[in-house]
Amino acid sequence: LDTWSYVQQFGKDKLRGVVTIDMSPLPLSPDPKWWTEGTIEELSQVATQVLTSSQGCREFFSEYATGVMIQHKMKPDELEYLLDISGRTPYWICRQLFCDAVFSNYLEIAKDVGATLPSLMFIAEHWQGIAKPFVEAQLPGYDTYVMGGHLMFYEYPEKWNRVLEDFLDKL
């Protein structure tokens, strides 16, 4: 989302290519065929009932880290490391960042980017069944690469960097 936000704010003039990681340009949609972050009800619950305290944020990130972000079974110290990093952001800012992401709509910008710049979308394996067809249909200019969980660059740095370097070498 940050890449598309940058393009919205500053344009594409200084860009030679775009890489995005495992996020739909339209994270919230009532259409079940679209790649979203969850149902409207699920996302509403997270925003209004979960991310309302430090403890709620910690529990959310713990569940998200073990279920979505990382594929391997983490040891307690690795999970604690990730929770410590996320816990440095106050819960009210986490909530605002979550809502800002969920309610964003960069679909038209993402389409334009894919049509005019070399573009690579990394997709987490757990999303590939819906995300890959979504990107192929809605963002046909994007190359896609499926690997890992949401934190694929953390969990598989050599493989991720190799794919990134191959993309950058073509620019």
What are these regions (language model features)?
Residues D2-S5, E63, Y81, Q96-D100, ...:
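Alpha-helical elements of Rossmann-like donor-binding domains used by nucleotide-donor carbohydrate transfer enzymes
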Residues W4-S53:
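Flexible "cap/lid" loop of the alpha/beta hydrolase fold
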Residues P140-L171:
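Catalytic active-site module of serine/aspartate enzymes centered on a nucleophile-bearing elbow/loop
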